[in-house]
Amino acid sequence: MWLELGAMLRTTCGPLGRAVRLPCAGALRLRPHWWGPCRDCLAQRVHQDQPGRGLTEDEIRRAREARLRKAPRPQLSDRSRERKVPASRISRLASFGGLAVGLGLGALAEVTKKSLPGGSLQHEGSSPFLTEANAERIVQTLCTVRGAALKIGQMLSIQDNSLISPQLQRVFERVRQSADFMPRWQMMKVLEEELGKDWQDKVASLEEVPFAAASIGQVHQGVLKDGTEVAVKIQYPGVAESIQSDVQNLLALLKMSVGLPEGLFAEQSLQTLQQELAWECDYRREAACAQTFKKLLADDPFFRVPAVVEELCTTRVLGMELAGGIPLDQCQGLSQDIRNQICFQLLRLCLRELFEFRFMQTDPNWANFLYDASSHKVTLLDFGASRAFGTEFTDHYIEVVKAAADGDRDRVLQKSQDLKFLTGFETKAFSDAHVEAVMILGEPFAASGSYDFGAGETARRIQGLIPVLLRHRLRPPPEETYALHRKLAGAFLACARLHAHIACRDLFQDTYHRYWASRQTLPLPAAS
């Protein structure tokens, strides 16, 4: 757990996919725009034999003018390519098998080259498996199969190079920035299976090329018949059924070829990851979570949640109101005051989610937070990884944070045992390292004035503790903490990247008193 948290604090979370917006097929004249009016030729009507009323020229003009007034939209990565998703387990296994053979042949060629007079590895001391050719094989395979395998690759991209080799980190950084999208026929098949053959009756138009492609699905821009712009997320076929096998195949392959560090993916963390991926593949669950957050944040002055489009929601298709804005990592050019406000609100949201709602969207991807400068609000996206927290967990967890904020090391140790982080039989080296890690993370809540997130060395200090924490841990941490600490680390990282100065102590103290007031009881004493 501390390994994941420390690594998260060292680098950025992966974007959903952005850079150069690809023009629609109609604009490129590769083939007709397949449904609805072409975005770049809006007055043109194609497929007029399809059922449903198309937009009038006046409606198109008004929609275009409204779109120009709205905030920027995410854009597809220029590295993304149209590529069929292997939908069956056999075809996905074949992809991993082909990768294993390719890595072996590539490594053999590299070793052979080294054995020749004057030969050497591409990088001195590097693994023969991690040649440029093999790196490209890994990237291409993960971007082809997508699903759980690509998700793990994106997770590994944010590990610090003290945990995985710089070579492997560079490989997974390329994976993080790339995600291919499925071809038209495969996407059409999913839409027809989920929404029926008459799904076109539900929309006025839907763009053929997605504006985002990620590990589980891709997102298309569409327009309802009333002119409402929507984002339609379509899941890749086969990814939900292949979660466990994909995880096992990829990790076995990587451990065999490039040697992932011991403890990076412990058994319990793998089980938790597989459960989270299963949640993310259930779009009906995600729609329900989005609606829950929309109610919880209905009166919030800073955050908004797009409306769910019920008629476009199934297990593998999710329609929501289209949102505009820029991801958090693109807010660095804003004024110090605006950056402080954004980060303050982000931390306030995290504390509300955990200690007021006890329901949190745990994906720290910066593309899930879109800042709209015109309204000075942030739109929240992607609720697939949302989860609830029980009161027993939050009762103890808030006391751990409170002890760290108060600088009480003994109470941090005791409350960590109450939380079942520790058994009480750990070595002194482990207990000291655990307490020190908690105290480091509690520093923003202990500072009497504004805390300068950009000036701290939080990540480096925690990284130094990780070897001890891995070597001497007697029990896995509570399963709730895997996702929780990813989210908190992502929030701290955003504050550091934006060089925010925030008075965190008052924010937490207010949260603490409100929490116990809502529980109508006194803070829990330490267990004897």
Curated annotation (Swiss-Prot):
Homodimer; homodimerizes via its transmembrane region. Interacts with COQ6 and COQ7. Interacts with the multi-subunit COQ enzyme complex, composed of at least COQ3, COQ4, COQ5, COQ6, COQ7 and COQ9. It is found in: Mitochondrion membrane; Cytoplasm, Cytosol; Cell membrane. Pathway: Cofactor biosynthesis; ubiquinone biosynthesis. Keywords: ATP-binding, Cell membrane, Cytoplasm, Kinase, Membrane, Mitochondrion, Nucleotide-binding, Transferase, Transmembrane, Transmembrane helix. It is an enzyme of class 2 (transferase). One of its GO terms (molecular function) is ATP binding. GO terms for cellular component: cytosol; mitochondrial membrane; mitochondrion; plasma membrane. One of its GO terms (biological process) is ubiquinone biosynthetic process. Atypical kinase involved in the biosynthesis of coenzyme Q, also named ubiquinone, an essential lipid-soluble electron transporter for aerobic cellular respiration. Its substrate specificity is still unclear: may act as a protein kinase that mediates phosphorylation of COQ3. According to other reports, acts as a small molecule kinase, possibly a lipid kinase that phosphorylates a prenyl lipid in the ubiquinone biosynthesis pathway, as suggested by its ability to bind coenzyme Q lipid intermediates. However, the small molecule kinase activity was not confirmed by another publication. CDD domains: ABC1_ADCK3. Its EC number is 2.7.-.-. Adopts an atypical protein kinase-like fold: while it adopts a core fold similar to that of well-characterized protein kinase-like domains. The KxGQ motif completely occludes the typical substrate binding pocket. Nucleotide-binding opens the substrate binding pocket and flips the active site from inside the hydrophobic core into a catalytically competent, solvent-exposed posture. A motif (KxGQ motif) lies at residues 151-154. The chain crosses the membrane at residues 93-109. Residues 187-419 form the Protein kinase domain. In the kidney, expressed in glomeruli, predominantly in podocyte foot precesses, as well as in proximal tubules and collecting ducts (at protein level). This is Atypical kinase COQ8B, mitochondrial. Belongs to the protein kinase superfamily. ADCK protein kinase family. InterPro entries: ABC1_dom, ADCK3_dom, Atypical_kinase_ADCK, Kinase-like_dom_sf. It is a single-pass membrane protein. It holds the Pfam family ABC1. ATP binds at S215, K233, M320, E321, L322, A323, N368, D382.
